[in-house]
A protein has these predicted regions:
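Low-complexity, compositionally biased segments
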Residues: 12, 20, 42, 63-65
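N-terminal acidic leader/helix
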Residues: 3-32
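Short edge beta-strands and adjacent turn/loop segments
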Residues: 25-49
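Helix-rich interaction surfaces within compact, conserved domain-sized segments
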Residues: 57-76
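Acidic-enriched, low-complexity/disordered segments with a strong bias for Aspartate over Glutamate
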Residues: 39, 55, 60-62, 81-82
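A short interface-forming secondary-structure element
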Residues: 5, 47-61
């Protein structure tokens, strides 16, 4: 398993928003922040709890959130205390 890079909540939120808006149909969607999953010891230790849809369709955003979490979760972990 490849090691992930630690990011602050602000950094990870920025990365997730950029990736989310790059997905088809999600140009106006955004997240407020990511949430730490405290009992997770390996792999992705964060989740996207809420998304502001903007003009995006929920079906497009659902697909995009799953894709973004999967892709960025392999690269980054959320640092515990900001």
């Amino acid at each position: 398993m490849m090691a992930t890079v630690g990011r602050s909540n602000a950094e990870l939120t920025e990365l997730v928003n950029a990736a989310l808006r790059g997905q088809p149909g999600c140009e106006t969607a955004r997240i407020i922040g990511v949430r730490l999953m405290p009992d997770v010891r390996s792999g992705r230790n964060w989740e996207i709890p809420n998304v502001v849809l903007g003009d995006s369709l929920i079906s497009d955003v659902d697909r995009a959130v799953i894709s973004v979490q999967h892709r960025l979760g392999r690269k980054f972990h959320l640092l515990g205390d900001d």
